[in-house]
């Protein structure tokens, strides 16, 4: 949070997170949304923090990488039913849970099952590197398509010496070949994006 800004990532869960933040930071308006990539767990909570009417009335920037809507539609609408069935096996979601734990795939302990929604981007990041001011905060976005998601970007906040890696770097590299049937990623290209992030990000 800086003045009126809060960066919120990921409908019920997002609303609860925002309500919790406002208890401690004050009832500040959401002044921008950044969708780092086309996977539902990174945009599905949008309507929990911002309505379409409010976004339009206040001209709230909704930022996403080029190709975001096409890839979000392809994976979550066209292929969603089949991929959801397969994901049950991938995540072990039907396995028992108890006080001793739960079997998971190393990426997340559980998948949220609330309502999802989407807001169309108003700003597309279509250059390899692109700077943008969002309510007084300077962002520098770097496109990394075909890494963890078909449409993905990472960002740095140079004035705050911070870096948002989205899912470019994770200990599982879970989408090199995913059992749920998402597009297979190019491992070499993904590794090059990680190398580029190391050399380009000045924090």
What are these regions (language model features)?
Residues 2-5, 138-144, 162-167:
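Active-site-proximal beta-strand elements of phosphoester/diester hydrolases
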Residues 38-44, 69-72, 148-149, 170-174:
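Active-site environment of divalent metal-dependent phosphoester hydrolases
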Residues 131, 156, 162-163, 172, ...:
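Divalent-metal (often Zn2+) His-rich catalytic cores of metallo-beta-lactamase-fold enzymes
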Residues 26, 63, 69-145, 189-194:
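Metallo-beta-lactamase
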Residues 1, 134, 155-159:
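Active-site beta-strand termini and strand-to-loop segments that position acidic
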Residues 3-8, 203:
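Short, small-residue-biased leader/transition segments that mark boundaries at the very start
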Residues 10-61:
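Active-site metal-binding motif and surrounding structural segment of the metallo-beta-lactamase
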């Amino acid at each position: 949070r800086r003045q009126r800004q809060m960066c919120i990532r990921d409908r019920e869960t997002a609303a609860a997170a925002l309500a919790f933040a406002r208890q401690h930071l004050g009832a500040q308006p959401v002044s921008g949304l950044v969708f780092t990539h086309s996977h539902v767990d990174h945009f599905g909570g949008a309507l929990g923090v911002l309505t379409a009417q409010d976004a339009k009335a206040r001209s709230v920037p909704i930022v996403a990488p080029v190709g975001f809507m096409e890839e979000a539609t392809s994976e979550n609408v066209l292929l969603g039913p089949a991929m959801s069935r397969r994901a049950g096996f991938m995540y072990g979601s039907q396995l028992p849970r108890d006080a001793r734990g739960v079997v998971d795939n190393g990426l997340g302990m559980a998948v949220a099952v609330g309502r999802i929604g989407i807001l169309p981007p108003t700003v597309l990041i279509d250059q390899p590197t692109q700077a943008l001011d969002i309510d007084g905060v300077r962002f520098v976005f770097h496109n990394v398509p075909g890494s963890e998601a078909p449409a993905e970007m990472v960002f740095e906040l140079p004035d705050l010496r911070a870096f948002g890696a989205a899912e470019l770097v994770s200990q599982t590299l879970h989408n090199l070949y995913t059992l749920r049937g998402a597009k297979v990623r190019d491992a070499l290209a993904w590794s090059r994006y990680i190398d580029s992030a190391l050399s380009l990000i000045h924090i």
